[in-house]
Amino acid sequence: MSTVHVVAPVAVHSVPPAQLLPQTATPPAYAQTLGGEAASTLAQKKKSPPLSANKRKRSETADDSTDQESNTPSRKSRDGPKKKKANRACFHCQKAHLTCDDSRPCQRCIKRGIANNCTEGHRKKAKYLLDDEELEELKRKQNTVPSRKSEPRTEKPKPSEPPAQTAQAPAAPLPRPSLQAQAQPVPISAPAPIPASTSEPFAPNDPMFNLTFDSNFPFGSEAANLEYTILSAILGNPSPPDTTSPPPQPYPWPSDTLSFNSPQLDSFSSFPENVLPVISADNLLSSTGSLNYLQARTAKQQSTADPADLQCGDDASKYTRDGRCSSPPSFYMDKESAARTLLSPPPTDSPGSATSTVPLNEVAPFPRPGSHLQSITDRVKAPYDYTEGYHFLMKHLTTRFEKNDILRVVRALAIFRPSLIALQMPLSWDDEVFVERCFQRSLLELDKLISYSGTPTVVWRRTGEICLVAPEFCMLTEWSMEELMGQKKYIYELFENQSVVEYWENFAEHAFENTTQSVYSHCVLLKPSGAPVPATFCFSIRRDLFDLPSAVIGQWLPLL
């Protein structure tokens, strides 16, 4: 049977009937039909507050705020007043992305000791904040930069040129120098007079500032072409006149007018492939003008000129329309002597010339490196025979050394000779020719290095044959350069017997070692008279492309 709970009556005089039970309350009849457990569960649900969407958050009381402050850590208080944000930072603080202030100089710059340089920083304005005038100025700047890059260079004729030459001179081909830059060693008309009171070194209308840019020079960049044009103009024009002296008088040209077929223009318009135009500065600066220069160059080149050139007269004033030579005069030099023309100006017989009087046949050799390389290729047609050097060594040992010394040298040769033979076996004829050309090429570089050093130096092959000798070595040993270089001379012929044995033993030990290391030893050199010259000795071994010892560089210092 179900248990029936009797509920005591409650006075409800002051409570309205609607508020007596909630809307979700269970009817009493239904509660009576439930069991005990279900009734207790229902009572607990009635005690819990109903969920509503408009539930408000409980306002914090003073006790709650004190609890939260006690739980959170207290912040560190600032020392002094809070820094005010600056309207605009100075240049240094802006660059370093540091905080600045409104004072100038700012405190940070004062601490860093750069208060004198504390200035307002530059702030770039956004495009949408720019005014119409500022936008137009910005567009104008952007348009001027590419227009300057794409603007072609316009050629202007030099003020000193005659109208006939500018109009009738043909355009020079690509490998030919500029006619306007080099065809005028002396201006035809007198330059504009410069006032004596001016302080500028050059006049504003000086032709040097109005050079014609010629793109026909065979260089890869415009800067190199312009530089070559300026250098050509410097060599082709006299120096600026003195401000205190009157301007020089113009030099007269031949009486007839220059035409397209005149010899003066023909000499500049015909450029063979194997010659280079060279203009001497001393002749151009001489007081006799450009005609003396033509006379000097013609007299200089008579020995090497073509037969057709020799038929022409030496005097440049004879070049008229009636008496014109079919070929230009000998005005240029070949490639080998082009480099030394500026160093040794051509001689002339004119009394007013300022050039040096060097005999025609006494010209210091100053060939170009390209001619040396070409001569090496033309000269070296077969590989070098090293067996001849070893045969001479064996003959020299038997005539000069004792048996024990000969055995020591032979043992040293037996150490590295098998390695040389093994490395030479796979080489072909062309490989050996290439090795010899490389050796001759390396001698050019070594000759240059020896000229920079004041130490007695000799370069020889692995067989001992001398290839290069420094003048200091000749001074040390009293051997002449002709005796050492003119005929086959071996380095061990200049050594004392003990030094020869020690050299070959050291060479056998270091022939295939590191080439960056040098061998230091004591050596006794012999003069032509047989007098000994004790010295300290060091040598290093250079190997070729196939790892064969090719060149030996030795240096000596005398023991005083």
UniProtKB/Swiss-Prot annotation:
Taxonomic lineage from the root: Eukaryota, Fungi, Dikarya, Basidiomycota, Agaricomycotina
Function: Transcription factor which regulates nonfermentable carbon utilization. Activator of gluconeogenetic genes.
Annotated keywords: Activator, DNA-binding, Gluconeogenesis, Metal-binding, Nucleus, Transcription, Transcription regulation, Zinc
Pfam families, sorted: PAS_13
Keyword Cell cycle annotated: no
Single Gene Ontology MF annotation: DNA-binding transcription factor activity, RNA polymerase II-specific
Residue ranges occupied by any PAS domain in the UniProt entry: 442-515
Biased composition (Basic residues): 44-58
GO biological process: cellular response to starvation; gluconeogenesis
Region (Disordered): 28-88, 139-205, 301-331, 339-358
Designated name of the protein: Transcription activator of gluconeogenesis ERT1
Gene name as annotated: ERT1
CDD domains on file: GAL4 (cd00067)
Biased composition (Low complexity): 163-187
Disulphides: none
PROSITE patterns: ZN2_CY6_FUNGAL_2
Localisation per UniProt entry: Nucleus
Similarity remark: Belongs to the ERT1/acuK family.
